[in-house]
């Protein structure tokens, strides 16, 4: 992920189920990239956390401020980095793709079951496949793993094939419960 967020331009997507930490991961990326000399703007529904030094705009469809309309407005401000809370429709997808083509670094989330399906989803939204290929830098598929309580946790054996590739400390990390 570190290599993806350091790109000068392009589209970086995070996918996963609701509540899997997609926005949190992208907020961490924005915080890491923050520099007062960079113009970073977000359009979100809703703004989940306040990020210092980053201009965050909440979507408000009742007033005509959709992701697409907000993104158009943001691009007139010539940002370096844009975070689009979610690509939900063809118009937002198209604007995001074209923004990445014109030198912006775009982060967003998209609802698919896995990383590869994100490409098909963008194409289904009407984005030309060659445009997706031109700008998509990477897709992170994210899930949250369950944490096993201390009382239930038991170390489990691992295969010899895996064991020889791990440090002694890493070998103790495999637990079930």
What name fits each language-model region?
Residues 1-177:
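Short, flexible helix-loop junctions that flank or precede catalytic/ligand sites
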